[in-house]
């Protein structure tokens, strides 16, 4: 698929994709994903063509931007590494997030409280989000999925080839997708304007690590705010015991008495 020159992959975005290991696929390859393989390393890891990854990101963003109501786009992630990215994507684009376990019947059982009728579904992994894809096929909802080389593509309309198991890779793909959607909607005025949101915001963070960092910061603030106690003068009234005979010094009182005579 050829893109207009304005949609070409920039050197900065290519560096981000490589730094996040988006190009490192699985060792197994499904026949439908073979066109996305650039080459196979000696250790068996299939290297994904990031040029085709970018083309699919642009295609997916154009599909999302074509939906008038942003809330009609449902974004799902049962995988832990993708839940933060899904929530951030929904916050920036107005989509409806489904982070965590997908409740069966969300798209098919209208009696449930969580029933939704989206016009487009985006999933992080076709394996972990298989229930969402299955129900989408029942009600004719198109599906966009982040697919690794061993991911099934049944009922997936747009597959974005990438490493969908690493936390940095997942976060970066969702960030690039959100940025491209905002560009197409005109919220980001042109392609020369940098998006103020950093990719790190979409990366998964361990809750224990967050608590540990917060505890360390609070300790540092307490140490800075603690007042430093000044050295108090010694008013105990005790004097040093001096042996005047050994030192050869004459007490001041004796000197005064001798001078009077």
UniProtKB/Swiss-Prot annotation:
A GO biological process of this protein is:
ribosomal small subunit assembly
Q: Where is region (Disordered) located?
A: 211-261
Q: Where is the composition biased (Low complexity)?
A: 245-261
List the molecular function annotations (GO) for this entry: structural constituent of ribosome
Q: Where in or outside the cell? A: Cytoplasm
Q: Which GO terms describe its cellular component?
A: cytosolic small ribosomal subunit
Its signal peptide is: none
**Which SUPFAM superfamilies does this UniProt record tie to the protein?**
Ribosomal protein S2 (SSF52313)
- Which positions carry N-acetylserine? 2
What ranges does the record list as Acidic residues composition bias? 222-244
Under PROSITE patterns, the record lists:
RIBOSOMAL_S2_1 (PS00962), RIBOSOMAL_S2_2 (PS00963)
> Has keyword Ligase?
no
Question: Which UniProt keyword terms apply here?
Answer: Acetylation, Cytoplasm, Ribonucleoprotein, Ribosomal protein
Job description of the protein: Required for the assembly and/or stability of the 40S ribosomal subunit. Required for the processing of the 20S rRNA-precursor to mature 18S rRNA in a late step of the maturation of 40S ribosomal subunits.
Alphabetical list of NCBIfam families matching this protein? uS2_euk_arch
Tell me its family.
Answer: Belongs to the universal ribosomal protein uS2 family.
How is the subunit organization of this protein annotated in UniProt?
Answer: Component of the small ribosomal subunit. Mature ribosomes consist of a small (40S) and a large (60S) subunit. The 40S subunit contains about 33 different proteins and 1 molecule of RNA (18S). The 60S subunit contains about 49 different proteins and 3 molecules of RNA (25S, 5.8S and 5S). Interacts with RPS21.
What is this protein's record name?
Answer: Small ribosomal subunit protein uS2
Q: Which organism is it from?
A: Meyerozyma guilliermondii (strain ATCC 6260 / CBS 566 / DSM 6381 / JCM 1539 / NBRC 10279 / NRRL Y-324)
């Amino acid at each position: 698929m050829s893109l207009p020159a304005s949609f070409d992959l920039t050197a900065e975005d290519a560096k981000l994709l490589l730094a996040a290991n988006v190009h490192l696929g699985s060792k197994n390859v499904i026949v439908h994903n073979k066109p996305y393989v650039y080459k196979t390393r000696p250790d068996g890891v299939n290297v994904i063509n990031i040029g085709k990854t970018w083309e699919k990101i642009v295609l997916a963003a154009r599909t999302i931007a074509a939906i008038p109501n942003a809330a009609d786009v449902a974004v799902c992630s049962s995988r832990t590494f993708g839940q933060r990215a899904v929530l951030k994507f929904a916050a920036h684009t107005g989509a409806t997030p489904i982070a965590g376990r997908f409740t069966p019947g969300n798209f098919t059982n209208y009696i449930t409280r969580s029933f939704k009728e989206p016009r487009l579904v985006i999933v992080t992994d076709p394996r972990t989000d298989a229930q969402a894809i299955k129900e989408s096929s029942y009600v004719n909802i198109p599906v966009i999925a982040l697919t690794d080389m061993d991911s099934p593509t049944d009922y997936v309309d747009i597959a974005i080839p990438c490493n969908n198991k690493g936390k940095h890779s997942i976060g970066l793909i969702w960030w690039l997708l959100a940025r491209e959607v905002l560009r197409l909607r005109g919220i980001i005025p042109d392609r020369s304007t940098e998006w103020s949101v950093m990719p790190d915001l979409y990366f998964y963070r361990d809750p224990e690590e967050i608590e540990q960092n917060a505890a360390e910061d609070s300790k540092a603030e307490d140490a800075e705010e603690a007042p430093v106690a000044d050295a108090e003068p010694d008013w105990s009234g005790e004097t040093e015991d001096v042996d005047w005979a050994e030192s050869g010094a004459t007490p001041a009182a004796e000197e005064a008495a001798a001078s009077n005579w």
